[in-house]
């Protein structure tokens, strides 16, 4: 068969295979076009699940008569004009494929009128060459698109449609997702002439919560925590549910990037990590999150249906989302929005004004060739780049910090090091000690692991008991070692080193203090500096900016830790001991992890501080048990 150019209709039908999956795909594309046209009132009429008729009516700006034919042409759009526009997309549509693809697999009619026109015009395309026909019509300002007999000319596609009920359920879900991000737009959804959904415009927070309650349920709103988290051009807002409102399936997870509904692995991982300590692995968090960022920093042109995006700074986005959600979950009593509006206003009075984003949005285009959606971006001069700053939303609210989000699974290097660490004894020694251990400790504790491992020249680790302690043997003596106390000792030893490795924070943490807290800071500033913290002090505004932390504490909740140290009783305990008492200890599910901690601690021991370690060893007396045998 010779090479030849496909007919316009066939080319559009091929494109429709990606764009038009089912009636819900048509509704999504057409409603997004209405929103891009500035509509604040959209009506969606469906018949027989969308197979017979889909009608979208809006009150947007409309399409001029001379552009109606182009509207049905492939790769014709008013939303971008050049490559710069493509790299800074804020509109929902931009490829110019939807109308052409839909019209090739259905009987599509487009009727529109602009405010400048005295009459409306209607256009439709038909035939192998998709020739358009324009005729006058009666219509108010705005646009109506009717899609009749979807897949009438591709019977193979039509027979794969589900029942009317199933297809309409998918359409309903599309409208729900769009209504969650376009609060100022009214949506009406009908099926076979009956109104099924009607979302009124929501202009204030109470009205927005009502819409969220209608879509996500009253229980979600009752358990919702409000997020308003900012850093430079990044802004995270919305609601996350408390852990007790976890879901057995992932059916209440809505995330939007610059108003676009997306699915992204980086965002999903950050959210799961933030909930990791609260939810079991088989539970799912519920959330409605809006992420606004510079459009130059995200690429939305990576998926046929634009459901996926790619971030230029994935690590920054991940850490920003993780810290924002973690702060909300750790401070539920502060962020819970079951308060009066006056309380919210009081919080806003205590905020620090966030610097404006370093990009500006141009007004709607005046003529074709101008992009009304792509912002003009101005690079910051590198030599004058200031330190990061952040806006607290509540009193003592702090920005995000560095987050090490490595996978929970050990890397190949870690596995190799573990293998070297877990060197087993010779078989004869294993047998002797194993028999002794089984004879002495059977039925006395829940033994998670019974491997016999040599962890130092003096102590041998026999077992990890209830994830809380190590059972150790030295000659004929046995000891229990608390892992929590061992971890706190390891922190103290690491922070007492002469040279402490520092970790710069990806996003510095900003503290707004009271006068009493600032006085406490001045008293403890040398102590913080000695152990590796680096602050920038602003005495006039009673503000501290944390830029560097000790590497050993990089995964800790530094906001909570620092504030606790500035409000503690100065006579309670030494500074370093009090600081380590504020740190959160990890849980140990494997003997290898516990042995790694023991090895790290022994490496830091010296002749002067070895006593502190030996005091943690609690002798085990087997004699009463032996007497009962």
Swiss-Prot record:
Provide one Gene Ontology cellular component: mismatch repair complex
Q: State the Pfam families in the record.
A: DNA_mis_repair, HATPase_c_3, MutL_C
Per the record, the domain of life is Bacteria
Q: Where is the signal peptide?
A: none
DNA damage among keywords: yes
Compositionally biased residues, Polar residues = 382-396
**Annotated InterPro entries:** DNA_mismatch_repair_CS, DNA_mismatch_repair_MutL, DNA_mismatch_S5_2-like, HATPase_C_sf, MutL/Mlh/PMS, MutL/Mlh/Pms-like, MutL_C, MutL_C_dimsub
Ranges for the region named Disordered are 376-396
Q: Which UniProt keywords apply?
A: DNA damage, DNA repair
Listed GO MF terms: ATP binding; ATP hydrolysis activity; ATP-dependent DNA damage sensor activity; mismatched DNA binding
Keyword rRNA-binding assigned:
no
Gene Ontology biological process: mismatch repair
Per the record, the similarity remark reads: Belongs to the DNA mismatch repair MutL/HexB family.
NCBIfam families, per the entry: mutl, PRK00095.1-1
Q: Any idea what job this protein has?
A: This protein is involved in the repair of mismatches in DNA. It is required for dam-dependent methyl-directed DNA mismatch repair. May act as a 'molecular matchmaker', a protein that promotes the formation of a stable complex between two or more DNA-binding proteins in an ATP-dependent manner without itself being part of a final effector complex.
Q: Which PANTHER family match?
A: DNA MISMATCH REPAIR PROTEIN MLH, PMS, MUTL, DNA MISMATCH REPAIR PROTEIN MLH1
| Protein name per its UniProtKB record | DNA mismatch repair protein MutL
The gene that this protein is the product of is mutL
């Amino acid at each position: 068969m010779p090479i030849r150019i496909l007919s316009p209709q066939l080319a559009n039908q091929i494109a429709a295979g990606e764009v038009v999956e089912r009636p819900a795909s048509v509704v999504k594309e057409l409603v997004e076009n209405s929103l891009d046209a500035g509509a604040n009132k959209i009506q969606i009429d469906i018949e027989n699940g969308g197979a017979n008729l889909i009608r979208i009516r809006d009150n947007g700006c409309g399409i001029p008569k001379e552009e109606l034919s182009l509207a049905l042409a492939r790769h014709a759009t008013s939303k971008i004009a050049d490559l710069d526009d493509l790299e800074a997309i804020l509109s929902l549509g931009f490829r110019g494929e939807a109308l052409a693809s839909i019209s090739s697999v259905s009987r599509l009619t487009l009727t529109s009128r602009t405010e400048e026109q005295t009459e409306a015009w209607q256009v439709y395309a038909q035939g192998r060459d998709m020739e358009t026909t324009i005729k006058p019509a009666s219509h108010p300002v705005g646009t109506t698109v009717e899609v009749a007999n979807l897949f009438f000319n591709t019977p193979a596609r039509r027979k794969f449609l589900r029942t009317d009920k199933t297809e309409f359920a998918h359409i309903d879900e599309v409208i729900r997702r769009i209504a969650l991000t376009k609060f100022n737009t009214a949506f009406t959804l009908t099926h076979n002439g009956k109104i099924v959904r009607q979302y009124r415009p929501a202009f204030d927070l109470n009205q927005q919560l009502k819409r969220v309650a209608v879509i996500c349920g009253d229980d979600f709103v009752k358990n919702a925590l409000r997020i308003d988290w900012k850093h430079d051009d990044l802004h995270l807002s919305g609601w996350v549910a408390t852990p007790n409102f976890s879901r057995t399936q992932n059916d209440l997870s809505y995330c939007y990037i610059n108003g676009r509904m997306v699915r992204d692995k980086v965002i999903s991982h950050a959210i799961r990590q933030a909930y990791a300590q609260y939810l079991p692995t088989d539970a799912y968090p519920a959330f409605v999150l809006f992420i606004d960022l510079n459009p130059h920093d995200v690429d939305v042109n990576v998926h046929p249906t634009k459901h996926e995006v790619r971030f230029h700074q994935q690590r920054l986005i991940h850490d920003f989302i993780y810290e924002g959600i973690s702060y909300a979950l750790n401070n539920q009593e502060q962020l819970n929005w079951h308060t009066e509006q006056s309380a919210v206003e009081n919080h806003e009075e205590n905020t620090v004004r966030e610097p404006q984003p370093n990009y500006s949005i141009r007004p709607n285009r005046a003529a074709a060739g101008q992009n009304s959606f792509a912002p003009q971006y101005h690079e910051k001069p590198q030599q004058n780049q200031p330190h990061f700053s952040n806006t607290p939303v509540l009193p003592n609210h702090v920005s995000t910090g560095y987050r090490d989000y490595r996978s929970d699974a050990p890397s190949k290097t870690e596995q190799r090091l573990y293998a070297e660490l877990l060197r087993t004894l010779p078989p004869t020694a294993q047998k002797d000690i194993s028999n002794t251990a089984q004879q002495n400790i059977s039925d006395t504790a829940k033994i998670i692991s019974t491997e016999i491992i040599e962890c130092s020249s003096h102590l041998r680790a026999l077992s990890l008991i209830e994830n809380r302690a190590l059972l150790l043997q030295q000659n004929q003596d046995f000891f229990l070692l608390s892992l929590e106390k061992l971890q706190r000792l390891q922190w103290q030893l690491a922070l007492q080193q002469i040279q402490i490795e520092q970790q710069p924070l990806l996003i510095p943490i900003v503290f707004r203090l009271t006068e009493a807290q600032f006085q406490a800071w001045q008293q403890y500033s040398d102590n913080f500096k000695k152990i590796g913290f680096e602050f920038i002090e602003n005495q006039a505004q009673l503000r501290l900016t944390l830029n560097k932390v000790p590497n050993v504490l990089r995964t800790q909740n530094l906001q909570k830790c620092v504030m606790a140290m500035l409000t503690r009783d100065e006579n309670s305990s030494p500074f370093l001991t009090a600081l380590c008492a504020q740190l959160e200890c990890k849980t140990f599910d494997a003997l290898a992890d516990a042995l790694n901690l023991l090895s790290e601690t022994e490496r830091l021991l010296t002749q002067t501080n070895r006593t502190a370690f030996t005091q943690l060893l609690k002798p085990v007396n087997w004699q009463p048990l032996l007497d009962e045998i």
